[in-house]
């Protein structure tokens, strides 16, 4: 990168304009779905998803921009949504305020594509504001919530804390949460392809 060349670009007073997230997610999704970034590979379906912080961005995009940002033919950019324990709700841009805890906007919206949410017991244990809605097969709001009891937010494959102050000496969970996330991906694919949850 060239700091002098790009010095004129501004991203808010603290150098972080989160409002650009939504434009980037939409533009990249549209380009991928249109086959502009995939070379000889053909795109059959696009899925948006993430875990923890990126899960929160996924929830925000799905709730706020999924029905607004579309392909040229009016169809969805993303054919399915996978929410991985979004524990907070990001601001729409650098100037907006935080949502209050348990704001209704932290609940997954009714969309025209299937959505699966995977959660450990952390949202309950730590009072995270995200709460899934009821399971539904309604074509205007297909949704499933997989709540995995006994799992922690990070899962067994995550590295241990590097900060000794955060390590209380107790054994970390060996619960294979990643397997449930993989299972959710498989179920979401089947639901999107075959219409079976």
Residue positions per predicted region:
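C-terminal His-loop and adjacent cap/lid subdomain of alpha/beta-hydrolase
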Residues: 1-197
């Amino acid at each position: 990168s060239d700091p002098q060349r790009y010095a004129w670009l501004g991203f808010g007073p603290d150098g972080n304009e989160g409002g650009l997230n939504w434009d980037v997610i939409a533009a990249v999704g549209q380009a991928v779905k249109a086959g502009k970034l995939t070379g000889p590979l053909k795109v059959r379906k696009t899925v948006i998803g993430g875990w923890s912080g990126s899960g929160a961005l996924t929830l925000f995009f799905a709730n706020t921009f999924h029905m607004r940002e579309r392909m040229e033919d009016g169809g969805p950019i993303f054919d399915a949504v996978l929410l991985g324990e979004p524990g907070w709700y990001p601001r729409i841009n650098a100037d907006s305020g935080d949502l209050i805890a348990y704001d209704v906007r932290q609940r997954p919206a009714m969309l025209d594509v299937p959505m699966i949410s995977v959660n450990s017991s952390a949202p309950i244990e730590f009072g995270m504001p995200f709460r899934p809605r009821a399971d539904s097969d309604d074509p205007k709001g297909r949704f499933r919530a997989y709540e995995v009891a006994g799992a922690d937010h990070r899962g067994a494959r995550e590295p241990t804390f590097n900060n000794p102050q955060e390590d209380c000496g107790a054994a970390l969970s060996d619960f294979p949460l990643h397997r449930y996330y993989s299972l959710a991906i498989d179920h979401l694919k089947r639901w999107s392809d075959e219409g079976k949850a």
